Design a protein with these regions (language model features):
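NTP-binding/hydrolysis catalytic cores, primarily Walker-type P-loop NTPases
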Residues: 72-141
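Conserved P-loop NTPase nucleotide-binding/switch module
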Residues: 1-62, 71-77, 82-86
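Flexible loop residues that form catalytic
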Residues: 65
Length: 141
């Protein structure tokens, strides 16, 4: 609800943050956050909320819940990363732009897709860019 607007204000401090919401996809999460921000009052338009979200959020990691049944009938619930999108400033009509970094694959972990240039700094923290590109290229074959 309206606490999403407060979340943006906290994120704008630039000290880093992590937040959760429930949605069917990463794009749906962004749409939901826009709607939640608008619940803060008439002063928050969808355009303002979308623009501020595009500046405040770097990544959306969507987690799915898989239900499986073993051959002996034992049921298991397992969470897996379904997709990761990079969020950036977008066109005037939407306010933010989404770039799919890891895309959904049915019954499998998300597959590497595209690494935006601004995320290359992750290499300084142990992210293997060469492996990412090799896997992304292999997934497209």
């Amino acid at each position: 609800g309206p606490e999403a607007w407060l979340m943006i204000k906290a994120m704008e401090s630039g000290s880093g943050s992590l937040s959760t919401t429930h949605a069917a996809s990463a794009a749906d999460a962004m749409d939901k956050l826009v709607t939640c921000c608008m619940e803060a009052g008439r002063h928050v338009s969808s355009e303002l909320a979308a623009r501020k979200l595009g500046r405040a959020i770097d990544l959306v990691v969507h987690i799915r819940l898989d239900n499986t049944i073993d051959v002996d009938g034992t049921r298991h619930r397992r969470r897996a990363v379904s997709e990761i999108v990079a969020v950036g400033q977008g066109e005037v009509d939407l306010g933010y732009a989404l770039t799919t970094v890891f895309s959904p694959v049915p019954n499998a972990p998300a597959s590497p897709t595209l690494l935006p240039d601004h995320l290359r700094v992750l290499a300084h923290h142990g992210f293997d860019i060469d492996t990412f590109h090799a896997q992304a290229t292999g997934a497209r074959r």
